[in-house]
Amino acid sequence: MNTTPGTVGSDPVILATAGYDHTVRFWQAHSGICTRTVQHQDSQVNALEITPDRSMIAAAGYQHIRMYDLNSNNPNPIISYDGVSKNIASVGFHEDGRWMYTGGEDCTARIWDLRSRNLQCQRIFQVNAPINCVCLHPNQAELIVGDQSGAIHIWDLKTDHNEQLIPEPESSITSAHIDPDASYMAAVNSAGNCYVWNLTGGIGDDVTQLIPKTKIPAHTRYALQCRFSPDSTLLATCSADQTCKIWRTSNFSLMTELSIKSSNPGESSRGWMWGCAFSGDSQYIVTASSDNLARLWCVETGEIKREYGGHQKAVVCLAFNDSVLG
């Protein structure tokens, strides 16, 4: 892979943030310095994801996904995927980078072949409500789709079969994630609850079976994202209550609460904690929030190690990759 010295792709740590100010910003994670800003025209950015080979970043917005080059300083998207009628809320990649998946307010999850010169989507999974989140099972063969009616759909890409479960009717599923070991799936909803399932199957032709494990009353307000740590020992949940909470997967007890609440009684809310991403060693976490900042925290102590300031509006999504490719 050719990386130009001084580009984002040449840095072993890639940290990108985006949101409502129509920019994607790239940061030196250790120093807090913004190294590159890309103008994302026409739309806010709802989701960011770095390709597995670290060559590009996908920014999902209103009616399109734009791919920006990490190995040059080209300010323009090198590929644009269009043809979606509403906001795209979620984006991710197959581990080999062969295809991309998205989900959005047009009630569809889509698969896009990244090797094809044709920029149309190849497969569509239609549901009956706007989609908030899509995540890929580590087996690379099942997509988990969460929608605003409260349903979670498990779309088997090999057979096109799908299963559905509704943990809490009428509470919108805002985020779902499966840990890297494929032991657990978590989902959070608009009521602030986090549901966890044990996973079995999902190998060969066996479809994944979900066995309810626990319900965590994680937040008093809207929950926005859940993410397992790379070592599968932690689960983070982010919320409109201005906190990101970190739970131990050994017993799903609370380990650390990261809060952006002001200690000054007169100060109004600093806004929602929109999203998070763990470092590769699971010892740090980066959060995105609507006070225009991203922050790097120590997971164990809850201490803020770095703040990333420069966005003019809410930061609602981020992408973090500090894995060095062999």
Curated annotation (Swiss-Prot):
The keyword Amino-acid biosynthesis does not apply. SMART domains: WD40 (SM00320). There is a cross-link at residues 86, 215, 245, 261, 305 (Glycyl lysine isopeptide (Lys-Gly) (interchain with G-Cter in SUMO3)). It comes from the Eukaryota. GO terms for molecular function: protein serine/threonine kinase activator activity; protein-macromolecule adaptor activity. It holds the Pfam family WD40. Keywords: Acetylation, Cytoplasm, Isopeptide bond, Lysosome, Membrane, Phosphoprotein, Repeat, Ubl conjugation, WD repeat. Subunit of both mTORC1 and mTORC2, which regulates cell growth and survival in response to nutrient and hormonal signals. mTORC1 is activated in response to growth factors or amino acids. In response to nutrients, mTORC1 is recruited to the lysosome membrane and promotes protein, lipid and nucleotide synthesis by phosphorylating several substrates, such as ribosomal protein S6 kinase (RPS6KB1 and RPS6KB2) and EIF4EBP1 (4E-BP1). Part of the mechanistic target of rapamycin complex 1 (mTORC1) which contains MTOR, MLST8 and RPTOR. mTORC1 associates with AKT1S1/PRAS40, which inhibits its activity. mTORC1 binds to and is inhibited by FKBP12-rapamycin. Within mTORC1, interacts directly with MTOR and RPTOR. Component of the mechanistic target of rapamycin complex 2 (mTORC2), consisting in two heterotretramers composed of MTOR, MLST8, RICTOR and MAPKAP1/SIN1. Contrary to mTORC1, mTORC2 does not bind to and is not sensitive to FKBP12-rapamycin. mTORC1 and mTORC2 associate with DEPTOR, which regulates their activity. Belongs to the WD repeat LST8 family. This is Target of rapamycin complex subunit LST8.
